[in-house]
Amino acid sequence: MLITAPLLIACGADSTHPAPYVQPLNNRLANYTVNTPLRMAHFLAQILMESDRMRTAEEYASGAAYEGRRDLGNTQPGDGVRFKGRGLIQITGRANYAALVKAFGLDYIAHPTWLEQPDDAVHSALLYWDSRKLNGWAEKDNVLAISQIINLGNIPRPGSKRQIPNGLSARKALLAKCKTALGVGAAVPVT
């Protein structure tokens, strides 16, 4: 299925921002086997949520909250701000930026703002999606698991302090819009 700006708007993208992402999405989705309407619906819903409906490829917050977060690889002073969320899925932390350097051969450590460019923003989101095997969860229509992996970094163990990802109800609403726009049946997502 071809991605168009009207399709992205029907999925919930802000009407003034999706055009720069259309060609990168069309160029790259199939390479990461985001190639069924259900997989596409889940992927698009998550990137719409993470990018404030394609209004930004840079996290609004300063990134100071990530300072010293060794779980993100932020081991040097200033890493939190330098490696705040970028791209359509908000890649966060020195370790995740370093993984992109290794995968793409582009120096995102020296040039973190490159992830704000449309092709890099899309490509980084797809690599993250693929590396976390999110197509499998999409095939199970499990919006909760996908949202936990993207927003919390993993599926929390029972009894963990934080179980519910930020904006879960908004993620579900975006998924419903994406399913409608892509013609996916009325399957009820796992919550």
Where are these regions (language model features)?
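Non-transmembrane alpha-helical segments in soluble domains
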Residues: N26, L44-I47, A125-L126, S147, ...
